[in-house]
């Protein structure tokens, strides 16, 4: 226990201007700029990404090709993210953030121009979407290393909770905004996305805090630094636990979400009813994120992680026997309600146990592990539902959740720190 508690101390020095600050993170000018940049980025991306396949379909391309563009874009982001993490731990992070935003703006701006002119070229859209995702991954890698510089340790829990609430709100508002813009004209969401990236660049540039990572000694070869980030995560028991738990939860929740959509469609539910499922889940996630800092300050961190893991077992089992669309929505809303508190606990402790010079690499390793399995969830859910039926898939997920909960319970000692 003693060794684990020592690791709770910040591994890198805090800047003087944030060392003694105890105000709400949102009252900090630079954190507010950072928070707003992420909100604008998320809204623009949600507004365009959901409707880009529709634009390709409208141009006469097949659904398979439209799906290929989306898949290539996602894979490009996953591949670039660990590479960007190395450079985000080498270079000043703020220039990386606004430069990446400008690249993404140019990529989406070029698609906007071609769509507005009525000349949609598949290869151009594919390349632009891949570049946009790669730039977004670069921005995310640099951003993942900033929290320690913008917020003092006692503010980590609230800051991460605010970031969670922002992301959940974007998931609710973004698709609706995109739908409204698409009704105006099919190129309007693309223009909004390009403009949003320009705003992100301006907001990132306006941050005054020095976000340059701490360095110890000369720069090592790229491959060595890439491997160092992976080795650090593998060598730190808590971070290994985060990788397993996050990857497992993302895969299972993704499968459950798509199971609910497929099952509702099979029961004759229309688009509005299926949209209700996603809306209820989004509202649950938003409420959970808003409540997370309050809960984390009052409940031991280990209890939050193990308790949430076990609660997901009956929830998944309940989905196996649900027969109405609103039931799917309420059950998924319940899951979404409890996950943010666990995320706040895990992310707060991950920042505390990681040296500043490794923050971006740590963040990209965890993010790639979690997102990589989530990409496979829709395909896996579709195949399994078609082969075994929705009820069997939901019960299988419940069994997998039970295994994950047992793993979390056996590793509860790793989550020794109360949230600050």
Language-model-derived ranges and their functions:
Residues 79-83, 90, 94-106, 110, ...:
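C-terminal transmembrane bundle of multi-pass solute transporters/carriers
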């Amino acid at each position: 226990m003693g060794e684990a508690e020592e690791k709770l101390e910040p591994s890198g020095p805090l800047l003087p201007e944030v060392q003694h600050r105890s105000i709400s993170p949102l009252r900090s000018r630079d954190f507010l700029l950072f928070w707003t940049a992420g909100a604008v980025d998320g809204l623009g991306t949600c507004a365009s990404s959901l409707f880009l396949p529709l634009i390709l379909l409208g141009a006469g391309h097949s659904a398979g090709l439209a799906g290929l563009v989306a898949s290539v874009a996602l894979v490009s982001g996953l591949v670039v993210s660990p590479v960007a993490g190395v450079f985000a731990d080498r270079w000043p992070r703020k220039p990386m953030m606004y430069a990446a935003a400008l690249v993404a703006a140019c990529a989406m701006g070029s698609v906007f121009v071609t769509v507005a002119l009525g000349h949609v070229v598949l290869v151009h859209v594919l390349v632009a979407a891949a570049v946009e995702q790669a730039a977004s991954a670069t921005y995310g890698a640099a951003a993942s290393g900033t929290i320690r510089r913008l917020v003092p340790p006692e503010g980590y829990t609230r800051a991460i909770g605010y970031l969670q609430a922002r992301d959940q709100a974007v998931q609710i508002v973004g698709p609706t905004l995109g739908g409204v813009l698409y009704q105006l004209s099919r190129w309007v969401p693309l223009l909004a996305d390009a403009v949003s990236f320009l705003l992100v660049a301006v907001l990132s540039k306006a941050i005054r805090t020095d976000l340059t990572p701490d360095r110890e000694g000369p720069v090592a070869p790229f491959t060595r630094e890439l491997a160092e980030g992976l080795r650090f995560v593998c060598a730190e028991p808590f971070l290994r636990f985060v990788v397993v738990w996050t990857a497992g939860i993302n895969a299972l929740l993704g499968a459950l979400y798509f199971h609910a959509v497929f099952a509702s469609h099979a029961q004759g539910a229309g688009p509005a009813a299926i949209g209700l499922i996603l809306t209820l889940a989004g509202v649950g996630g938003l409420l959970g994120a808003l409540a997370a800092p309050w809960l984390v300050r009052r409940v031991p961190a280990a209890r939050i992680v193990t308790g949430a893991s076990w609660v997901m077992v009956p929830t998944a089992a309940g989905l196996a026997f649900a027969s109405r669309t609103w039931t799917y929505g309420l059950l998924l809303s319940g899951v979404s309600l409890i996950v943010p508190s666990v995320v706040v606990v895990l992310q707060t402790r991950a920042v505390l146990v990681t040296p500043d010079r490794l923050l971006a690499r740590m963040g990209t390793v965890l993010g790639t592990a979690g997102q990589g399995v989530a990409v496979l969830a829709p395909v896996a859910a579709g195949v399994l539902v078609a082969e075994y039926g929705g009820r069997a898939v939901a019960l299988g997920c419940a069994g997998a959740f039970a295994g994950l909960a047992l793993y979390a319970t056996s590793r509860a000692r790793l989550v020794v720190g109360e949230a600050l």
